[in-house]
From Swiss-Prot:
Pathway: Carbohydrate degradation; glycolysis; pyruvate from D-glyceraldehyde 3-phosphate: step 4/5. The modification N6-acetyllysine is found at residues 5, 60, 64, 71, 89, 126, 193, 199, 202, 228, 233, 256, 281, 285, 335, 343, 406, 420. Binds two Mg(2+) per subunit. Required for catalysis and for stabilizing the dimer. It comes from the Eukaryota. It is an enzyme of class 4 (lyase). The modification N-acetylserine is found at S2. The modification N6-(2-hydroxyisobutyryl)lysine is found at K228, K281. The keyword Phosphoprotein applies. There is a cross-link at K202 (Glycyl lysine isopeptide (Lys-Gly) (interchain with G-Cter in SUMO2)). Mammalian enolase is composed of 3 isozyme subunits, alpha, beta and gamma, which can form homodimers or heterodimers which are cell-type and development-specific. ENO1 interacts with PLG in the neuronal plasma membrane and promotes its activation. The C-terminal lysine is required for this binding. Interacts with ENO4 and PGAM2. Interacts with CMTM6. This is Alpha-enolase.
Amino acid sequence: MSILKIHAREIFDSRGNPTVEVDLYTAKGLFRAAVPSGASTGIYEALELRDNDKTRFMGKGVSKAVEHINKTIAPALVSKKLNVVEQEKIDQLMIEMDGTENKSKFGANAILGVSLAVCKAGAVEKGVPLYRHIADLAGNPEVILPVPAFNVINGGSHAGNKLAMQEFMILPVGASSFREAMRIGAEVYHNLKNVIKEKYGKDATNVGDEGGFAPNILENKEALELLKSAIAKAGYTDQVVIGMDVAASEFYRAGKYDLDFKSPDDASRYITPDQLADLYKSFIKDYPVVSIEDPFDQDDWDAWQKFTATAGIQVVGDDLTVTNPKRIAKAAGEKSCNCLLLKVNQIGSVTESLQACKLAQSNGWGVMVSHRSGETEDTFIADLVVGLCTGQIKTGAPCRSERLAKYNQILRIEEELGSKAKFAGRSFRNPLAK
């Protein structure tokens, strides 16, 4: 079934910034997709095209990306009469039309919007759920429900507090189903709110961009202490583990790291990569920390390699790998990390996202599917994580509707699968291992 019409528009993301939405029509109906946007972005990400017209939306408009879709991409795809199930062919055509390494002509936000809409249309064309269509595209015979990694304490570039490390997450690995994992996550979240309120007052329970709390604490260890206490209060000490996203590129300063980077600059407090690694190891020893994302700067390859070799936990590459097959191949060759963070808008098409995932998995890595801090009500990544069988997803706290939209969609998928539903649980790092 070919594409009859494509129409793009500017809509608003969860931070009140414009983003791209695409409507794609086939004889089967309308298929709509919206593109997310990150705050702490890796320098190697595909280009998100913004207007940079300071008189409009502080320069963050996306009318150029929208125009590229409406005036260039849409007519080309409609005239070619390509079948929407041919995801790779359509993505390839857009990439060739763009002609740049990082999608800077059309913008990754333009290409991705169309790519996501095509994928949704392809599923309906085949008469299967979206997660099944994605599983087919990836060559996966089965599907798996992921462990959710709830970002319940926000710091770094996502929050106005002093905390340097960006995300402190809870993973209910001891749950027996996704629905139970949601309940555990929600109960720990509410206990955490009470713990923070008692210790720091009601003001401290305001939430950050991803629905997590952002109490004004400086010590990263204090965030772990709060989590440990909330998990215990909720009665889930044996069932919940902790993950972190440090986003260390945000506080990398000339070969060292500044754990108080939101205060006036003072080089005397910078610490070395080895000192930072020792700090992480103390966290791993004292708390149930099983996963650390972006522990070092995106170009501090030596520090990554040393840490991954000795930490004994999941080390996730985000800014390091930016969902880019070339960066993933380099990181795999150097054993820099052992898990890929998969963000569709870092690479800018469904096909390349699937390739990045398969490449990571073929190197024995785990894969965690991720939202961005600027999100929409689009739920594509919920189906993506199930179809790709990655076993883990992070899409915020159990708070804020743009986050819950994804979690609720996974609940529906679990219900639809019925007795065939398989939850990753404690095997979240390698859920396909028999």
